[in-house]
Design a protein with these regions (language model features):
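N-terminal secretory signal peptides
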Residues: 1-10, 14-26, 32
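Hydrophobic small-molecule pocket/channel-lining residues, especially in calycin-type beta-barrels
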Residues: 34-219
Length: 219
């Protein structure tokens, strides 16, 4: 990759630590752009290092560590099998990746979700179900719940949800751009795998239709 030529080896090592490599590809691309703009690596390396130091946290914040475990198991790298349930029973499959870790002094968790995976051939323009986005998960002690902020600039899709534990699962409730109820859930959670469900309701929340599921395995 071009950025390996431009970025120093120690910077690659440091960014790889950042949130289980979640931000490493984004930061590396930023460093490459800075290098091209300024004709050298020293300035861009320093700027990337500054962002890494300010954003990354090695562990959850001590003042709420007992609550951060709801999503703490997500920290690390994952591969996902994406299954899209289309109209009339049609199914589309793809492969993707997730990178997650602690940020903002450990008071939040950030993860990057990418479909298809970066080592796969990507369509231009993006195909149905392709995305490259990030989630910021912030625990709110007043609500005893999590603010979920999803941003996918590739498709201009943005979601705000509230996440809570429901038994052994995690359920995030919100709405889509039409106001229809949307439910995203983490289920079947183990130390090395989970199943994620994306559902939407067309009747105000009485019933939900499964649109997509991700079967994730830790790597």
């Amino acid at each position: 990759m071009p950025m390996r030529v431009i970025l120093r080896r120690e910077l690659i090592s440091k960014t790889a630590v950042l949130i289980g490599t979640a931000a490493a590809p984004l930061l590396a691309k930023g460093a490459l752009a800075q290098t091209q703009a300024h004709g050298g690596s020293n300035m861009s390396d320093a700027r990337v290092s500054s962002l890494v130091d300010a954003l990354h946290a090695n562990h959850p914040a001590a003042d709420r560590a007992d609550k951060m475990g709801l999503y703490g198991w997500l920290v690390g790298r994952w591969t996902i099998d994406a299954i899209y349930h289309l109209n009339e029973g049609t199914i589309r499959r793809s492969r993707g990746e997730i990178h997650a870790g602690w940020v903002l002094e450990g008071r939040a968790l950030q993860d990057v979700w990418i479909v298809p995976a970066r080592d796969a051939q990507r369509a231009d323009p993006p195909g149905p179900g392709d995305f490259y986005g990030t989630t910021l998960r912030v625990y709110d002690p007043k609500l005893d719940a999590w603010h979920i902020l999803w941003s996918d600039p590739l498709n201009q899709v943005y979601r705000q949800q509230i996440g809570r534990a429901h038994g052994d699962d995690i359920v995030q409730d919100g709405t889509d751009e039409t106001g229809a109820p949307v439910r995203w859930s983490f289920t079947e959670i183990t130390p090395n795998s989970f199943r994620w469900l994306g559902e939407r309701s067309a009747d105000g929340g009485t019933t939900f239709r499964l649109l997509v599921e991700f079967l994730a395995r830790r790597i």
